[in-house]
């Protein structure tokens, strides 16, 4: 008998045939579908693997390779036939098996699987001719050797699996404890809710009158028995140990299965088939879920949870909010109508329906329904007046308090002065008079400066405010322009002043702007001091000036009046001290006082947009003290005072009464002449500013719509009158100059042409101005300003014309000449003569020709003619031919006969009269 070391060798016996030993490989044939009805026979092999434990492999590795002839006593134990599998107990009762026991369990499971698949394989009789085979030899379970690194990796993986298993068990225990605590808390809250519900039922039962029902006793829900935590993992059992008859089968589940899963649908366990139905009694449990933001707000707010909630995120509801929520829930359960709350509704002059409903705490739909019942179809966004709003509010049962939008301005100029804090203040003196009478030169002589040299053309085009000191007393001077275009500036200066100095040139006497200044001073009820200037000239005549002032009710002291007059010379600085003494004397008579401790208010003298400093307003503080950091409202602009600059260019910490300063920090450029006041907060300042801006927009829209009228009126007006406009964009250095230019250009307008100011403002010419001028086909006028680089490039690209001026005379003259070009020329008609038609002839090539005799004047060829029949003009045109006999002539004098033909007209008869005239077009000017 031949014995081989390999399992696959042939063994030969004396009387036996050659056979192959079982190799653990099962073969079979299946039919594979190849498509389109074709099949193919495929051989399928099923191999059976018997894994071994790492301990057996390590024990057998030093002695040589598995399968050698060396003894293998430390190798894996032979696989025994397992006992019949018992029916497993419920899965919940079986402790979870740790991972170290898995190899042995897998061997058992594999053997069981083999036994089920091949039940007759183990009972197959063995050949009796193999007495020399060792039953303890392993049958090739390990197919290859493992290196030391692979063994270390396996050991590390096994250790990590054990650690993970312990951590998972600990985490599951902690989660179970937390779930138990949550369940207890839920049961407690359910009990409280049941008690509250019972109390509500009791209250409802007491309120019921018809059939009172007995109040059910509150039954607390039975507390569920908390489920015990998972037991600790058992120690690994020996690899070859068999399970006891009554013991549960070991579990091979690696992870925790979801709770509530039906055991009937789980299928057989890995240890063996499930014989019966597995029932695990477990109480129903509400799965925990994270709270949403709305649910976090549902808890009651107590002292301990006032800051944060249980998660440390959002604060819970207050007790009042919780009480309101419970009351709302109770009303919804009882279906009680909500109690009507009567409110006091504040109604402005106009209000939208949506805002009115919000102030009444009513639904806008209800208000719309009420209006529909009254026959008014409106939407929530429609604006209604105060009368209709009051009617609606009264109908809904509310009281009404009507206010005006102008109430936001109440109190800002009504601050009362403290009589105990009143102190003397410097007088405010305005220098007024005709242009070129030396007002600015006089002020320069007083201030010992040279402002007039910096003025273009030697005339003042701004209001300048300065403060000088004389004998320890301060005097505030305001210099106003004398040109006719600056009427508003002079009026503004007269309103802000205490004393007016009327400057009259001794060599020029009283002029129109002098008279206007007198009227402004009298309208403002301001005392006048006459300063007769230029007495150093030879042609000076002060007496003539005094006599002319009498005609305008200005009585000087030398003429028996009360008006002080001083003869001065600004050039030679003569009698300037006398003029200042007269000012101080007049101020002493007026007894000027102010309260510096109150909030400041005053007047905006001038405003401009500076490139480096932004909006700069020259203001005159009339009351109180202005300091940096205060919030002021000037016209429709507001801002926080960033800095105060005096007339010398220095920064000051405060500006007292009668002190002129420049204010930096406004949000925009206010209009000259606006009043300013200090307010307590930015919100109040913003509210006042928005109201004034809205009011200005409404006024501008009303003015524009009133001028425009309907579309039909516009078209008919253009067709009838041929009205033309000269669009302009005006930019100046200060707001006062803009006003003067606009006023001067408005005076140039006539019924046929006028200047249309597309935009005007203070500041440099920008690219947006170029775009606006291009869109409106307007010219740009810059007064003491220039265009920046971007604006110049845009003007060259678009072809927009920019004109720069620094003297208002030149500006007005150029605009006047340009507007004159828009005027249609005047049509002037000159009568030439009359001719009477004696006979009408038909000429083949010419048509009808009238044989006429000139009875008055003369008739010229090419002149205009009218055909008059029965004193009615029936045709007007030109002569086509004029012949005397057969010759073309230029004209025919009176008493001679001629032949005439008309252009494109032949309805002529004998006895008609032909009137000849000449038309001339004459260019007009404004």
UniProtKB/Swiss-Prot annotation:
Residues 13-24, 70-96, 211-251 have a biased composition (Low complexity). Residues 433-440 are annotated as: G1. One of its GO terms (molecular function) is GTPase activity. Residues 533-536 are annotated as: G4. GO terms for cellular component: cytosol. It is found in: Cytoplasm. Residues 569-571 are annotated as: G5. GTP binds at residues 433-440, 479-483, 533-536. Residues 458-462 are annotated as: G2. Residues 1-185, 200-299 are annotated as: Disordered. InterPro entries: EF-G-like_DII (IPR053905), EFTu-like_2 (IPR004161), IF2_assoc_dom_bac (IPR013575), IF2_II (IPR044145), IF2_N (IPR006847), P-loop_NTPase (IPR027417), Small_GTP-bd (IPR005225), T_Tr_GTP-bd_dom (IPR000795). Keywords: Cytoplasm, GTP-binding, Initiation factor, Nucleotide-binding, Protein biosynthesis. Residues 110-133 have a biased composition (Polar residues). It comes from the Bacteria. Residues 151-185 have a biased composition (Basic and acidic residues). Residues 479-482 are annotated as: G3. Residues 424-591 form the tr-type G domain. One of the essential components for the initiation of protein synthesis. Protects formylmethionyl-tRNA from spontaneous hydrolysis and promotes its binding to the 30S ribosomal subunits. Also involved in the hydrolysis of GTP during the formation of the 70S ribosomal complex. Belongs to the TRAFAC class translation factor GTPase superfamily. Classic translation factor GTPase family. IF-2 subfamily. This is Translation initiation factor IF-2. It comes from Allorhizobium ampelinum (strain ATCC BAA-846 / DSM 112012 / S4). The lineage of its organism: Bacteria, Pseudomonadati, Pseudomonadota, Alphaproteobacteria, Hyphomicrobiales.
């Amino acid at each position: 008998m031949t014995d081989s070391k390999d399992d696959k060798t042939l063994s030969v016996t004396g009387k036996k045939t050659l056979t192959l030993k079982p190799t653990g490989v099962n073969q079979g044939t299946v039919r594979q579908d190849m498509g389109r009805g074709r099949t193919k026979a495929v051989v399928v092999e099923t191999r059976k693997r018997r894994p071994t434990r790492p301990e057996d492999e390590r024990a057998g590795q030093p002695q040589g390779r598995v399968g050698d002839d060396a003894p293998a006593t430390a190798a894996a134990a032979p696989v025994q036939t397992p006992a019949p599998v018992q029916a497993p107990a419920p899965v919940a009762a079986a402790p979870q098996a740790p991972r170290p026991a898995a190899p042995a369990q897998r061997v058992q499971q594999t053997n069981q699987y083999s036994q089920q698949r091949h039940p007759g394989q183990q009972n197959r009789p063995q050949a009796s001719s193999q007495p020399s085979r060792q039953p303890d030899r392993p049958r090739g379970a390990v197919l290859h050797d493992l290196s030391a690194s692979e063994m270390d990796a396996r050991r590390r993986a096994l250790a990590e699996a054990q650690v993970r298993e312990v951590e998972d068990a600990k985490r599951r225990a902690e989660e179970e404890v937390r779930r138990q605590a949550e369940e207890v808390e839920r049961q407690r809250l359910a009990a409280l809710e049941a008690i509250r519900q019972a109390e509500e039922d009791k209250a409802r039962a007491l309120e019921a009158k018809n059939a009172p029902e007995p109040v059910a006793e509150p039954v607390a829900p039975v507390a569920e028995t908390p489920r015990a935590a998972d037991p600790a993992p058992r120690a690994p059992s020996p690899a070859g140990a068999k399970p006891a008859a009554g013991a549960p089968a070991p579990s091979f589940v690696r992870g925790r299965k979801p709770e509530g899963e039906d055991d009937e649908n789980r299928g057989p366990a890995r240890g063996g088939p499930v014989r019966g139905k597995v029932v695990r009694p477990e109480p129903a449990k509400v799965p925990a879920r994270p709270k949403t933001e709305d649910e976090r707000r549902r808890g009651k707010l107590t002292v301990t949870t006032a800051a944060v909630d249980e998660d440390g995120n959002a604060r819970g509801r207050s007790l009042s909010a919780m009480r309101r929520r419970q009351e709302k829930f109770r009303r919804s359960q009882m279906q009680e109508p909500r109690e009507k709350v009567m409110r006091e509704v504040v109604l402005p002059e106009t209000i939208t329906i949506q805002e009115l409903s919000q102030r009444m705490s009513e639904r806008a739909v209800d208000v719309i329904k009420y209006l529909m019942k009254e026959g008014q179809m409106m939407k929530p966004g429609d604006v209604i007046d105060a009368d209709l709003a009051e009617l609606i509010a009264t109908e809904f049962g509310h009281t009404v308090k009507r206010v005006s939008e102008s109430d936001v301005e109440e109190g800002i100029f009504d601050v009362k002065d403290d009589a105990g804090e009143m102190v003397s203040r410097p007088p405010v003196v305005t220098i007024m008079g005709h242009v070129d009478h030396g007002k600015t030169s006089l002020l320069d002589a007083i201030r010992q400066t040279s402002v007039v040299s910096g003025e273009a053309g030697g005339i003042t085009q701004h209001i300048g405010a300065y403060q000088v000191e004389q004998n320890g007393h301060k005097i505030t001077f305001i210099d106003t322009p004398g040109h006719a275009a600056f009427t508003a500036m002079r009026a503004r200066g007269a309103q802000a002043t205490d004393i007016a100095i009327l400057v009259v040139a001794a060599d020029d006497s009283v002029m129109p702007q002098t008279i206007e200044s007198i009227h402004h001073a009298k309208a403002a009820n301001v005392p006048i001091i006459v300063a007769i200037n230029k007495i150093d000239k030879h042609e000076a005549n002060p007496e003539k000036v005094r006599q002319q002032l009498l005609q305008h009710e200005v009585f000087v002291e030398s003429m028996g009046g009360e008006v002080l007059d001083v003869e001065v010379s600004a050039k030679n600085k003569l009698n300037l001290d006398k003029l200042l003494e007269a000012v101080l004397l007049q101020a002493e008579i007026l007894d000027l006082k102010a309260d510096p401790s109150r909030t400041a208010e005053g007047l905006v003298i001038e405003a401009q947009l500076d490139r480096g400093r932004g909006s700069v307003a020259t203001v005159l503080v009339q009351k109180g003290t202005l300091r940096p950091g205060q919030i002021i409202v000037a016209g429709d602009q507001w801002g926080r005072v960033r800095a105060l600059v005096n007339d010398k260019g220095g920064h000051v910490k405060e500006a007292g009464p009668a002190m002129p300063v420049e204010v930096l920090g406004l949000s925009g450029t206010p209009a000259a002449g606006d009043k300013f006041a200090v307010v307590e907060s930015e919100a109040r300042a913003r509210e006042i500013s928005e109201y004034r801006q809205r009011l200005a927009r409404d006024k501008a829209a009303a003015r524009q719509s009133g001028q425009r009228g309907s579309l039909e009126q516009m078209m008919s007006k253009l067709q009838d009158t041929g009205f033309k406009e000269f669009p302009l964009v005006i930019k100046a250095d200060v707001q006062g100059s803009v006003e003067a230019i606009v006023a001067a250009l408005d005076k140039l307008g006539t019924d046929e042409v006028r200047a249309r100011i597309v935009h005007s403002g203070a500041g440099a010419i920008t690219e947006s101005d170029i775009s606006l001028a291009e869109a409106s086909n307007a010219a740009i006028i810059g007064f003491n300003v220039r265009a920046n680089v971007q604006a110049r490039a845009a003007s060259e690209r678009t072809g927009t014309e920019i004109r720069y001026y620094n003297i208002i005379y030149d500006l007005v003259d150029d605009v006047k000449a340009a507007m004159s070009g828009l005027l249609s020329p005047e049509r002037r008609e000159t009568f030439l003569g009359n001719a009477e038609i004696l006979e009408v002839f038909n000429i083949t090539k010419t048509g009808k020709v009238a044989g006429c005799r000139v009875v008055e004047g003369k008739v010229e060829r090419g002149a205009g003619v009218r055909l008059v029949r029965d004193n009615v003009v029936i045709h007007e045109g030109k002569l086509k031919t004029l012949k005397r006999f057969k010759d073309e002539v230029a004209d025919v004098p009176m008493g001679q006969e001629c032949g005439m033909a008309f252009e494109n007209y032949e309805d002529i008869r004998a006895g008609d009269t032909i009137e000849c005239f000449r038309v001339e077009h004459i260019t007009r000017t404004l």
